[in-house]
């Protein structure tokens, strides 16, 4: 139904009706159009053949598609990539296909997906490559020339992430800090540990995260390489010779760098007067491991027969037996050159490692018995970095590359988050965290003494903090051996249980605080025998939401 014609009072002529949509010519000249096609103005002007509806501008809030074209009149400069605006869904899809980190899952895929087929530069160390990223080493001209950019393009600082350029400064700072720890008696890490790191061009927004993934990558790819500075510096400290330098037989023995991993382990064990039965957790020396399972009555009976034995009556092998080869900082014992285990008063103290290599990890912590002691004596934060590096050293000495890849995958899910959560904390916050840990440990020790259940308490790095006497009766380990030498929980587990440990911990570190259950957890005794158990973990967090301690209960499976 058409509207009635309205007569204008000023002109006395019918008013021109507003058109629903102007034609293209009237739209350009901003003139009033009508609904006829061709309109009256186009007929008068001779544009009747081209009079069509004009195109309206779509409102921005109604536009579903972003304008991906650059502005009119602007052209990008040569060599500058113009990135179009993308929706969140498109951006996520493109980042996933290109291999760039977008979420935690993509970061995992980026670093773990290419591990089985790494790129090997001239220096012999495979690097964890990332699609679309240039790999650059800061280790000198020789390594920088290992990979050349394609197409004749030169690598300029503008093509690298901003935080990647300060990696070398970060490494120097951390080395200096670790050197200060050694001067204060807390530890002495060799700078060679960091000299062989393969720093890949990761583009995370955190320097600490980039550093962490470089350490994890190097942990996997330097495993089993005799010339790896990382493994040599952590296993042998700052010394380039065998620890048993006073033995005349060392002149005829091959150096550890020239031997295979298995031969190197046996050589160092024999040079320290240890017997074959002391190797209780090594897949590389599987002939030393007893595959039989002990029952709880046998272990209890064995412990009862040795309850009243004094330390002076123990044999030399029992005194020297380390918990494991790779992390036994070792009680300083004297042996003569023939390695028979007898004491030599004139020779200096020796251990499997150099005296200061992992001292920060295995220094005996004070035993607090009262809350006042906790709040009064704890004035410095607890350093988790030496413990983490000690754990990596142990894993590299025990497991093969395929197992290390699986463990690194799980570590990559929680380790960078630990660093990110603690970066914003002040020193007073870290001191308070340690006070909370020790205060909570006091209460748990009371509860463990009353519960009667085999129980262990360890930190998020895996270092044992408390052990119940029931666990000692179950496993055969003494409390002095487990707590006095700052043992890792993974040392008490067999290979499959260690892999399951890292998988469960990555799931509960920032997930369900109620803990997890390991239906089949196999413990290792001092003699290398295995005990099947079922364990339950309870995770306790600090006031900042970080995992503080894990309480594990172990019950034997007798069937």
Curated annotation (Swiss-Prot):
Residues 440-512 form the PAS domain. Residues 139-159, 231-244 have a biased composition (Low complexity). Pfam families: PAS_13, Zn_clus. This is Transcription activator of gluconeogenesis ERT1-2. Keywords: Activator, DNA-binding, Gluconeogenesis, Metal-binding, Nucleus, Transcription, Transcription regulation, Zinc. Belongs to the ERT1/acuK family. PROSITE patterns: ZN2_CY6_FUNGAL_2. Residues 63-159, 231-263, 329-349 are annotated as: Disordered. Residues 245-260 have a biased composition (Polar residues). Residues 23-51 bind DNA. Transcription factor which regulates nonfermentable carbon utilization. Activator of gluconeogenetic genes. It comes from Yarrowia lipolytica (strain CLIB 122 / E 150).
């Amino acid at each position: 139904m058409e509207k009635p014609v309205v007569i204008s009072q000023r002109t006395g002529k019918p008013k021109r009706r507003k058109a629903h949509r102007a034609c293209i010519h009237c739209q350009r000249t901003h003139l009033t159009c009508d609904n006829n096609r061709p309109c009256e103005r186009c007929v008068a002007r001779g544009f009747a053949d081209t009079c069509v509806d004009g195109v309206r501008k779509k409102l921005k809030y109604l536009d579903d598609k972003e304008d991906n074209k650059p502005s009119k009149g602007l052209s990008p400069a040569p060599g500058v990539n113009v990135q179009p605006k993308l929706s969140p869904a498109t951006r996520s899809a493109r980042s996933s296909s290109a291999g760039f980190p977008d979420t935690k899952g993509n970061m995992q895929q980026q670093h773990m997906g290419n591990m089985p087929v790494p790129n090997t530069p001239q220096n012999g160390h495979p690097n964890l490559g990332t699609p679309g990223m240039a790999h650059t080493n800061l280790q000198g001209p020789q390594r920088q020339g290992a990979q050349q950019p394609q197409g004749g393009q030169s690598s300029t600082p503008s093509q690298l992430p901003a935080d990647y350029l300060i990696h070398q400064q970060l490494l120097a700072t951390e080395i200096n800090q670790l050197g200060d720890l050694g001067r204060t008696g807390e530890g002495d890490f060799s700078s060679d540990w960091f000299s062989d790191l393969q720093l890949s061009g990761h583009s995370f927004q955190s320097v600490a995260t980039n550093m962490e993934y470089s350490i994890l990558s190097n942990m996997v790819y330097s495993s089993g390489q005799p010339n790896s500075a990382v493994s040599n510096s952590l296993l042998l400290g700052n010394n380039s010779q065998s620890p048993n330098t006073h033995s005349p037989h060392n002149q005829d023995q091959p150096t550890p760098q020239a031997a295979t991993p298995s031969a190197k382990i046996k050589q160092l064990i024999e040079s320290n007067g240890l017997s074959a039965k002391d190797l209780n957790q090594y897949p590389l020396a599987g002939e030393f491991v007893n595959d039989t399972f002990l029952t709880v009555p046998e272990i209890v009976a064995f412990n009862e027969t040795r309850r009243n034995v004094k330390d002076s009556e123990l044999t030399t092998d029992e005194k020297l037996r380390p918990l494991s080869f790779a992390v036994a900082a070792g009680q300083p014992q004297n042996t003569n050159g023939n390695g028979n285990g007898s004491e030599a008063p004139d020779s200096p103290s020796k251990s499997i490692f150099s005296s200061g290599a992992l001292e920060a990890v295995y220094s005996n912590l004070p035993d607090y018995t009262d809350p006042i002691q906790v709040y009064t004596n704890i004035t410095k934060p607890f350093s988790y970095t030496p413990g983490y590096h000690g754990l990596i050293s142990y894993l590299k000495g025990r497991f093969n590359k395929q197992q290390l890849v699986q463990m690194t995958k799980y570590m990559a899910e929680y380790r960078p988050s630990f660093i990110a959560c603690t970066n914003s904390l002040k020193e007073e916050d870290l001191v308070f965290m340690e006070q909370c840990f020790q205060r909570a440990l006091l209460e748990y020790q009371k509860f463990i003494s009353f519960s009667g259940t085999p129980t262990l308490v360890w930190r998020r790095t895996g270092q044992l903090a408390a052990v119940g006497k029931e666990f000692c009766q179950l496993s055969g380990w003494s409390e002095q051996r487990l707590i006095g030498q700052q043992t890792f929980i993974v040392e008490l587990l067999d290979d499959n249980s260690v892999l399951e440990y890292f998988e469960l911990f990555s799931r509960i570190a920032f997930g369900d605080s109620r803990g997890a259950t390991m239906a089949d957890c196999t413990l290792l005794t001092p003699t290398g025998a295995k005990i099947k158990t079922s364990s339950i973990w309870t995770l306790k967090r600090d006031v900042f939401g970080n995992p503080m301690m894990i309480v594990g209960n172990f019950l034997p499976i007798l069937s």
